[in-house]
A protein has these predicted regions:
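Non-catalytic substrate/cofactor recognition surfaces at enzyme active-site rims
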Residues: 1-142
Length: 142
């Protein structure tokens, strides 16, 4: 259950959408150069505690669902900032995976990633935020 195969990208070379076609060309070139594509991306999460404020810095273009959930679950003064330390891609939420669409399926081509993230993305990110928050003494309310 990894990235699309080289053959899958070759089948996209006749794609009418120029961006999708160019993405397929880049992924084929990467297969030929490296013999494989990345199956995971190192995602940056940073948490700072400044007095009563907990600043959560998340990489990428994070959707509002993350901020709403973290504020609800961590309580207190929580500030969630996206575009922090890396602009890896659009970061969809679990709700969006159920809906599908551009952000979940197609946006990866503009960030030069081989394919969409997996539906458990939100849980992995939120879980790591909670782990880091506990280390700083932030107690979850939920």
């Amino acid at each position: 259950d990894g990235p699309p195969t080289k053959e899958e990208f070759q089948s996209r070379l006749n794609e009418k959408n120029v961006f999708k076609r160019h993405h397929a060309e880049r992924m084929i070139a990467r297969y030929e150069r490296d013999g494989k594509l990345i199956a995971e991306y190192p995602y940056t999460i940073q948490i700072l505690k400044i007095g009563d404020l907990t600043l959560i810095a998340l990489a990428g273009e994070v959707v509002t669902d993350y901020a709403l959930r973290l504020k609800r679950e961590l309580g207190g003064d929580v500030w969630v900032a996206g575009y922090s330390n890396d602009l890896c891609s659009y970061i969809p939420s679990a709700r969006m995976f159920k809906e599908g669409g551009y952000e979940v399926i197609d946006s990866m081509i503009y960030y030069d990633l081989p394919g969409p993230y997996k539906p458990e993305l939100e849980e992995r990110i939120i879980g790591k935020v909670h782990e880091l928050a506990r280390r700083l003494g932030v107690k979850a309310t939920k």
